[in-house]
Amino acid sequence: MSKLTTGSFSIEDLESVQITINNIVGAAKEAAEEKAKELGPMGPTAMAGLASYRSWNLLLLDRYEPVLTPMCDQCCYCTYGPCDLSGNKRGACGIDMAGQTGREFFLRVITGTACHAAHGRHLLDHVIEVFGEDLPLNLGESNVLTPNVTICTGLSPKTLGECRAPMEYVEEQLTQLLATIHAGQESAEIDYDSKALFSGSLDHVGMEVSDIAQVSAYDFPKADPEAPLIEIGMGSIDKSKPLIVAIGHNVAGVTYIMDYMEENNLTDKMEIAGLCCTAFDMTRYKEADRRAPYAKIVGSLAKELKVIRSGMPDVIVVDEQCVRGDVLSESQKLKIPVIASNEKIMMGLPDRTDADVDSIVEEIKSGAIPGCVMLDYDKLGELIPKIAEVMAPIRDAEGITAIPTDEEFKVYIDKCVKCGECMLACPEELDIPEALEYAAKGSYEYLEALHDVCIGCRRCEQVCKKEIPILNVLEKAAQKSISEEKGWVRSGRGQASDAEIRKEGLNLVMGTTPGIIAIIGCPNYPAGTKDVYLIAEEFLKRNYLLAVSGCSAMDIGMFKDEDGKTLYEKYPGTFAGGGLLNTGSCVSNAHISGAAEKVAGIFAQRTLAGNLAEIADYTLNRVGACGLAWGAYSQKAASIGTGCNIYGIPAVLGPHSSKYRRALIAKNYDESKWKVYDGRDGSEMTIPPAPEFLLTTAETWQEAIPMMAKACIRPSDNNMGRSIKLTHWMELSKKYLGVEPEDWWKFVRNEADLPLAKREELLKRLEAEHGWEIDWKRKKIISGPKIKFDVSAQPTNLKRLCKEA
């Protein structure tokens, strides 16, 4: 082979010559070096793969041991099965019950991750097509725009186009993760847990890309603590106007409907309202300048079937995620057209993407089709308002609704034979027979009370031998309260600004702000929507920082105090103690985890890029935070919570969530699990059992409250912070459980840690019950605590972070 030499030649006289330049020698290296200079310091795990976080994950899983709650004893994954795995038996492929249960949980986590990532991909591609890849990311007064992206990939995108790389990274890793579920792949439960944690971190990347893309492109509020207040509830809808109802999570198509309404002066002539997270994002559209909003929120996922049965919508447009599988069949009964606007949910409807808008309207008006698929958003924007205008008078004239008349109501009540099948089928175990029995005697308040607790699943109706439309009966009994159902919720503000993080970071790390309480997730509550309101109210009164999102954020806004004010009207939307900030829809959850990460990056000056273990170690030991997904039902909720767990942020779930099959709970009595390094010299130091779980469930909201307060205690709390946190935890335990916690003394390092109002009493108890030596003249603890307080200690789980390592 001849040796290549350098030189030059002229192409001026050459004809019919095609020159292809592949890589310019040295150019890629130079570009990479320039990019590295721009990004700054880089941690060890940029563009992490399946094994990159394994050592950190196993460290977490060693302390927070998986507690498995399998749903059944069988595995039905392949044609060898079904295999009985009970009694420590293994399946034909060799997998045991632990491995199979780990696989089941992991499958739910990657499903949730894929859902958010696919949402982000669709949204990102669409806004790039419309607004161009050079559109800057504008999230408000922030320089740290993408903490989750930066931690996992090492990248810090500044434009829409630069968001493609992290999106491609998530998609590639999801393919690798999905492959591990195949028969004959991973079988160790502990490694499925590790992979689940990795998938959770990817989920927060996908969510972050989704929300920063729409915040930037659609002019959503940008880190705005005074984002507009939005009307919520069925009572907020003007029933004299045609009603468009949007259901789902991807707002891209709905923005075209709103544009058409604005351009054609229809915003005061018809109502547009949403269910689930599309509802939040349509109320954020073009609200960066705080214009008067006109879009409304009907409610959460639990309201979907109730709204359809009411007959109020004149057209329903669905996009993706959290859309009931019976939306079309239920809507057809009431002549409500359904338009599918996203490839992920097409409902078997005819595709009319290439058809003329007016011809589609005519088909729907005549009843030739019950709805259609419409993937052309320009046409969608015109189609939906036109259908609403045409169908509203037709449906009004026929008085279409599933709500029974007074006569029908009486007949249905009298048909009940008290067999109890409905109660057995109900996920909430509602005593429907008893309520119907009282109703038969003329007392309807019991039926009315079930309206808020009912999650609208319709399982009761399907087992009723007398074919009573139970959901309709409940709605009939609650007509008055439904008509008055009106609250206020703050539109999603987006992320916490860098300035807010700098100001509040010290309070969070020292513990003087007791903690961040994040109330997120779905409406599968065990005892009605008011639970999340009561939890939020309690923590706000105690100056915790509350971050909320999704369906839970909606339900918090549905209740008012004795002065007629919602929590959103009473408390500021700032990232500070006593603040109630609604970040927005489900994908905005990335801003909640991102806030904890930004405390490490901005306040503590830790390197974010490619540095997950160090950031997670910081939040685990220093940032008091706890999540609550009280009504979690979906795979997305599992992936969101698991993504918090890898960062050392614990989460409490409602009682239904044991069906996810896995919890992460430490043994608070095993002292060997509560040893860390002191970053100053690498010596071993003992810490209190805090937090004592990463993922667990509670049976009641009264149990959850003190559990969450305790979960905000951190090893690095200073004396004032520990005293404040112990005060709240002990008071809340006494208030809601009737007893003080039995292990409060384990968190006392010296007398300054004790709650100020009860210091002398607690010193006496420490002396009498635990044998601690007290100097009563100075009221100081002489001996007793196993944990010594050292204000300069640097607790860390990572040996490499120690100065003498």
From Swiss-Prot:
Keywords, in A-Z order: 4Fe-4S, Iron, Iron-sulfur, Metal-binding, Methanogenesis, Nickel, Oxidoreductase, Repeat
Reactions accelerated catalytically: CO + 2 oxidized [2Fe-2S]-[ferredoxin] + H2O = 2 reduced [2Fe-2S]-[ferredoxin] + CO2 + 2 H(+)
Any one Gene Ontology molecular-function term assigned to this protein's record: 4 iron, 4 sulfur cluster binding
Gene Ontology biological-process annotations: acetyl-CoA metabolic process; methanogenesis, from acetate; nitric oxide catabolic process; response to hydrogen peroxide
Binding-site positions, [4Fe-4S] cluster 3: C416, C419, C422, C464
EC number: 1.2.7.4
PROSITE patterns found in the cross-reference section: 4FE4S_FER_1, 4FE4S_FER_2
Residues in 4Fe-4S ferredoxin-type domain copies: 407-435, 445-474
Chain sites annotated for binding [4Fe-4S] cluster 4: C426, C454, C457, C460
Binding site for [4Fe-4S] cluster 2: C75, C78, C83, C93
Positions bound to CO: H116
Any Pfam family the entry gives: Prismane
Cofactor requirements of the protein: [4Fe-4S] cluster; [Ni-4Fe-4S] cluster
List of residues binding [Ni-4Fe-4S] cluster: H249, C277, C322, C522, C551, C586
Cofactor note: Binds 7 [4Fe-4S] clusters per heterotetramer. Binds 2 [Ni-4Fe-4S] clusters per heterotetramer.
Residues annotated to bind [4Fe-4S] cluster 1: C72, C76
Pathway: One-carbon metabolism; methanogenesis from acetate
Domain of life where this protein originates: Archaea
Residue ranges of the TM segments: none
Function: Part of the ACDS complex that catalyzes the reversible cleavage of acetyl-CoA, allowing growth on acetate as sole source of carbon and energy. The alpha-epsilon subcomponent functions as a carbon monoxide dehydrogenase.
Assembly behavior: Heterotetramer of two alpha and two epsilon subunits. The ACDS complex is made up of alpha, epsilon, beta, gamma and delta subunits with a probable stoichiometry of (alpha(2)epsilon(2))(4)-beta(8)-(gamma(1)delta(1))(8).
The record's note on its domains: Cluster B is an all-cysteinyl-liganded 4Fe-4S cluster; cluster C is a mixed Ni-Fe-S cluster which is the active site of CO oxidation. Cluster D is also an all-cysteinyl-liganded 4Fe-4S cluster that bridges the two subunits of the CODH dimer. Contains two additional 4Fe-4S clusters, dubbed E and F, that probably transport electrons from ferredoxin to the B cluster.
HAMAP family in UniProt: CdhA
Family: Belongs to the Ni-containing carbon monoxide dehydrogenase family.
Record-given protein name: Acetyl-CoA decarbonylase/synthase complex subunit alpha 2
Species the sequence originates in: Methanosarcina acetivorans (strain ATCC 35395 / DSM 2834 / JCM 12185 / C2A)
